[in-house]
């Protein structure tokens, strides 16, 4: 195999998404992996598995294996096995639900236990979801950032509903795992709202203005 063939090979990363039920984990992963947003809440039983390939600076192709872990698995026998081997862990909470933030301590305790047993240290990111509901926020950004600083987490705020910063979150996590620095232009481009309308043929489409231009919501409302 030539050097060029080796260089063109994909890197693969296992990213595990943890947090309470209804924190928006599945909406977050589907918005990223499938560019859709489901209006109806459907509880994840066990886990869901998603794949998406992205390109990082230097034309590095990276396939993200995203493990969306059901919120009810905390304390379950399989949780350790789901986390094992992950290069990245996303701790997701709902910024309007204080308990979902408090319970991340329990999720992180399991991550630390698995890390100690496997002698590997995944990158851990704290993800505040549902920023489209800023007016209902119950967890102040300062508390979020303090939790990050105390534990060495990377910090992210996203909206799975609008797509705001969803791609950027996964992109930054993958880049940080691989030691790649994103420049300002790449970050700004990834912050754009994901274009991923859900088509419902039983309803008349509604027009809406979205900023920035030429982008749209992960859900049609």
Curated annotation (Swiss-Prot):
Entry-linked InterPro entries: P-loop_NTPase, Small_GTP-bd, Small_GTPase
Annotated positions binding Mg(2+): 26, 44, 68
Lipid bilayer topology: Lipid-anchor
Residues recorded as bearing N-acetylserine in the entry: 2
Stretches for region Switch II: 68-85
Positions that bind GTP: 21, 24-27, 38-39, 41, 44, 71, 129-130, 132, 160-161
Catalytic activity entry: GTP + H2O = GDP + phosphate + H(+)
EC number: 3.6.5.2
Protein's GO biological process: intracellular protein transport
PROSITE patterns documented for this protein: RAB
Regions crossing the membrane: none
Gene3D superfamilies on file: P-loop containing nucleotide triphosphate hydrolases (3.40.50.300)
NCBIfam families per the UniProt record, alphabetical: small_GTP
Connected disease: Cone-rod dystrophy 18: A form of cone-rod dystrophy, an inherited retinal dystrophy characterized by retinal pigment deposits visible on fundus examination, predominantly in the macular region, and initial loss of cone photoreceptors followed by rod degeneration. This leads to decreased visual acuity and sensitivity in the central visual field, followed by loss of peripheral vision. Severe loss of vision occurs earlier than in retinitis pigmentosa, due to cone photoreceptors degenerating at a higher rate than rod photoreceptors.
Purpose: The small GTPases Rab are key regulators of intracellular membrane trafficking, from the formation of transport vesicles to their fusion with membranes. Rabs cycle between an inactive GDP-bound form and an active GTP-bound form that is able to recruit to membranes different sets of downstream effectors directly responsible for vesicle formation, movement, tethering and fusion. RAB28 is required for shedding and phagocytosis of cone cell outer segments (OS) discs in the retina. Also participates in nuclear factor kappa-B p65/RELA nuclear transport in endothelial cells.
Subunit structure: Interacts (prenylated form) with PDE6D; the interaction promotes RAB28 delivery to the photoreceptor outer segments. Interacts with KCNJ13; the interaction may facilitate cone outer segments phagocytosis. Interacts with RELA; the interaction contributes to RELA transport from cytoplasm to nucleus.
UniProt note: domains: Switch I, switch II and the interswitch regions are characteristic of Rab GTPases and mediate the interactions with Rab downstream effectors. The switch regions undergo conformational changes upon nucleotide binding which drive interaction with specific sets of effector proteins, with most effectors only binding to GTP-bound Rab.
Protein name (record): Ras-related protein Rab-28
